[in-house]
C-alpha cells in the first residue's frame, strides 16, 4: 500500500470547523470508504484539544466488519497463525476500532440515541436512509465534529438518482408502481450549496461537485476571548450581574447559552410571583437545552419553598436530562444527597432505572414526583406542574393537566418529528386567547360578571430558544439540512396584497419534476408550500417531503389569486391540496387479504372500507384521497379551501377538458447515465434544463378517471362542518382516538357524478345507512365522550337526503313495547308520573327516531340533542345541562314535549291499524264501458252460441239409452187418472229387470259354489283318516 498525500483542503475544513465550533459534512463515494473514516477521524483527533472524539456508526443490517472486540482479537490471532497478517493494510482500521469509543446503532433503533452527543457520525447503507433518520443522526454531532455519509462505488453521481431506496416499496401500490427518485436528485444537487461539505472518492480525491472549496483558507489562530461572540459576552455579563442575587445567580451560572439563561430567569420570575396562575410555554428546536432549563427551574422552585412539584412526560425514561440538571442545580445551591434530599428510582425494567421521585427535607418536606400524563386527578395539592415534551402527549391530556397551579411546559418544534405543531397550533393558541380575554379592561357594566372569570384566568408567557447547545450559531450543516428537509419554514411570509374573491382564484397543477429540481425559483416555491403545510397541520415529518417527491400516486395542486399578465414573480400561494390516487385493486387481492386479515401498504381508504363492510368490490373503484388541504394562516376561514376543493372536484369530473392536441408529457423515469459517458472526477452536476413549466392550468393536463373523492382526518366539529358542506358523507369512524391528538379518525366519501345525476350512488347510500346504524349502537360505548351536538352532526347528513322509510306498523310497535309500556308513556306525557318510570324505553325510542322509522315526527335541534344524549349516550341530565347549556328544568320540559309527540304518533299508528280492520262500506264505482250496446249484445250472442254448440256435442256423444222412459200414451193416461190430481209419485210398469234382483243372482250362485268345494274337502279328509 503506497503512501499518498491527502488534499490539504480536507485538513483545513476539519480544523476550521473545530476552531469555529461548527460541523463538517463528508460524502465518501466508493466501496473502500470505511478505510477513509479512519483517516478523517485521525485528522479530527489531532485538530481537537480534548479526548478522542466518540463515534456513532449507523447501519441497516450488515456492518461489514465485526464490532465484537474479542471476536476481532480471535480473527487477528488466526491471521498471525496462518501468516496472512498484513500490518500496513490491517493495522489502521484495527487500531481505530480498538482505540475509539464507537456506538453501533441500527437505523431502526436511532430513537435511542436522542439527547446523546458524539464527535463523529458515520452513515452507511445509503438506500436505507430517510429524511427522518438523516435529521435525527446529524443532530447528535457536536460543534467541530464530522458527519460522514458512505456511498458505494459508482462511475457517476447521477446513478444515485435511480437508486431504489428501501422506503420506495411503501410508496408502490397495485395501480402505481413507477417510483421516480426526485428526492435523491435534490439531495445530490444540494451538496454543492453547503459550504462545509466535501464530496470525495475513496482515495480522498475531491470531486468537481465540491468546487466551491477551491479557495479554502485556514482561519488564523484565536485567543479564547476573541472566539467569543456577542451573545457569549452578554451571557458573561448577565452571570456577573446576578452574582449577588441568590438563588438565581448560581442557577444562571449553570446555563450554556444566553437564550437558556433568559428562559431560566423567566421560569424563576413565574415561581417568585407565587400567584399560581401563570403558564410558561417553552418552545425550541432539538438540542437547544429545554430539558436542562426546566431542571434548573425545578431546583429554583425548591429553593423558593415550593412543596408539591409534579413532573410529567410521555415516559420517565425521557426525563434523564431534566433530573440530571435538577441535581446540578441542587449542587449549585449546596444541597447534599442523603443529608438534604434522597432520590427514588423506578424498579420497572422498562424505565431503565429512571428517577421517579425526589424527597427534599432540608427546611421542610418537599417532593418532586413523576406522574403519568393520564393521572391528572392526582394533582389536587400541586403547586407547580412541569410538562416536558408536551407535544408528544395527547392534547386532551395536556389540557386536563392545566389547573389552579403554576404550569411550565416545554415542547419541541421545528424538529425532525415535527411534533410540536399540535401544541403551538391548538393549545398555545387557546391559551393566548384566554390570556388576552383576561387582560381586557373591565368596564362598570361587566365588572360584576367578569370578577369570577378574572380570578380563574391564566397568564401566558411564551419563551423560545434559538441558540444550539452543541454547536455555534450559523452552523452551515444545520442550514443545509434545514433547507434540504424544509425544516426551517416556520416563519411564513405575510401576504401584503388584498384578499381576492375566492370565485376569481384558479387551481393549478404543480409539476413535481420541476418543483424538486433544485432550481432557485422552484426552491422558493417549495419552501412556501412547506411553510403552509407546517402552519396548518399539527404533525409534519421530513419523511412527508420524500413521499411528496417520490410517491407515484401523489399529486399536488395549488390555489393562486388572479395573476396580472405583466407579473414576473411567483404569485402568493393561498392554498395547497395534496391528493393521493387510490383503488383499482384486483378483487382477488382484496379477497386474499380479507381472508388473512392483512392489508397492503398504501390505499388507505379502499382497504379500510373493504374491511369495515366486508365488500371486495369497493377496492376495484378508483378514488382520490385528499391528504392535505393547507390554507395560508392569514386567509383561513374565508372560503379559499372550499374553492380549491370545488375546483378539484370539477377537474376530476371532467369539467376542464384538455383541448390541446399535444399534451405535455412528463417523463416517468430519469434517464440513466452510461458508465462510459463521463468519469467521476470530471463530472459536473447541475440542475436539469429541459424541464416542463412548474404550474399547469387544469385544462392543460388530462385528469385521471375517478369514481369518488375521499378524505381521512381527525374528527373535530369545525372540520366535520367543512367536509359536510363540501358534500362528503361519513362511512367510517375509528373507535380508538389518535395517540398524539386524542381525535378519532374519520373517513368521508363523495361520489363523482355528472351534474344531472342528483343521487349519490347506490353503494354510498348503503355504506352510509350501515355506518349510521353501527354508530348509533356505539354511542353508549367509545363515542359516549362526544358532545351531543357533534354526534347529532354526524348522524344528520343532508347530502344523502332523507330516505323514504316505511311508516311504523302496529306489529313493529307491539314487538318493541308492551301495552303497559305505552300506558306508562301516556301517564308521563300527562305529568302523572316521574320520568324515571319511562327511562328504560328511551333507548328504543331514540334508536327508531334516528333511524327515521318514526315517520314525520319533527323535533327541534335541542330536543334531538337531548334525546340522543339520554337515549343513546346514556348521559345524566346534569351532564347534559353543561353540554347543551340549558338549565335542567328547561331540559325536562323539552323532554316531556318529546314524549308527548311520541305518544301521539304511537296512538295514531294503533288507531290506523284498528280502522283498517273494521269493515267499511264500499261504494260501487260505475265506470262507462268502451264498447257500444250492439257490440256488447253481439259478443254475448256469440259466446252463448259457442257454449250451446259445445253442450249439444257433448250430449250426442253420451249413451242415454238407460234414461229412456217406457210406456205408450194409453198406459200413461191410465196411470195418471188412477193417481188423481194431488199425487206426487206415480209408478209405471217397465219391461226392465229390477237392479236388486239382477245383483243378487250372481252372489247366491257364488255362495253355492263355495259350499260344494268345502263339502268335497271334508269328504277327502275323512277318507284319509
From Swiss-Prot:
Induction: Transcriptionally activated by genotoxic agents; possible role in DNA damage and induction of cellular resistance to genotoxic agents.
EC code: 2.3.1.-
GO biological process: negative regulation of telomere maintenance via telomerase; positive regulation of translation; protein acetylation; regulation of centrosome duplication; regulation of translation; ribosomal small subunit biogenesis; rRNA acetylation involved in maturation of SSU-rRNA; rRNA modification
One GO CC annotation: nucleoplasm
Changes after translation: Acetylation at Lys-426 is required to activation of rRNA transcription. May be autoacetylated; however ability to autoacetylate in vivo requires additional evidences.
Phosphoserine PTM positions: 934, 984, 987
Principal subcellular localization: nucleus
Boundaries of every N-acetyltransferase domain copy: 558-753
Inhibition and activation profile: Specifically inhibited by remodelin (4-[2-(2-cyclopentylidenehydrazinyl)-4-thiazolyl]-benzonitrile, monohydrobromide), a hydrobromide salt molecule. Remodelin can improve nuclear architecture, chromatin organization and fitness of cells from patients suffering from Hutchinson-Gilford progeria syndrome (HGPS); molecular mechanisms explaining the relation between NAT10 activity and nuclear architecture are however unclear.
Chain spans, region Disordered: 990-1025
InterPro entries given in the database record: Acyl_CoA_acyltransferase, GNAT_dom, NAT10, NAT10/TcmA_helicase, P-loop_NTPase, TmcA/NAT10/Kre33, TmcA_N, tRNA_bind_dom
Modified residues (N6-acetyllysine): 426
Region (Required for localization to the nucleolus and midbody): 702-1025
List of residues that carry Phosphothreonine: 716
Catalytic activities: a cytidine in 18S rRNA + acetyl-CoA + ATP + H2O = an N(4)-acetylcytidine in 18S rRNA + ADP + phosphate + CoA + H(+); a cytidine in tRNA + acetyl-CoA + ATP + H2O = an N(4)-acetylcytidine in tRNA + ADP + phosphate + CoA + H(+); a cytidine in mRNA + acetyl-CoA + ATP + H2O = an N(4)-acetylcytidine in mRNA + ADP + phosphate + CoA + H(+)
Chain intervals with Basic and acidic residues compositional bias: 997-1018
EC class: transferase
Binding sites annotated in the UniProt record for acetyl-CoA: 629-631, 636-642, 725
One GO MF term: RNA binding
Subunit structure and binding partners: Part of the small subunit (SSU) processome, composed of more than 70 proteins and the RNA chaperone small nucleolar RNA (snoRNA) U3. Interacts with THUMPD1. Interacts with SUN1 (via N-terminus). Interacts with TERT.
Protein family: Belongs to the RNA cytidine acetyltransferase family. NAT10 subfamily.
HAMAP family: RNA_acetyltr_Nat10 (MF_03211)
Functional description taken from the UniProt entry: RNA cytidine acetyltransferase that catalyzes the formation of N(4)-acetylcytidine (ac4C) modification on mRNAs, 18S rRNA and tRNAs. Catalyzes ac4C modification of a broad range of mRNAs, enhancing mRNA stability and translation. mRNA ac4C modification is frequently present within wobble cytidine sites and promotes translation efficiency. Mediates the formation of ac4C at position 1842 in 18S rRNA. May also catalyze the formation of ac4C at position 1337 in 18S rRNA. Required for early nucleolar cleavages of precursor rRNA at sites A0, A1 and A2 during 18S rRNA synthesis.
Descriptive protein name: RNA cytidine acetyltransferase
Upper classification of the organism: Eukaryota, Metazoa, Chordata, Craniata, Vertebrata
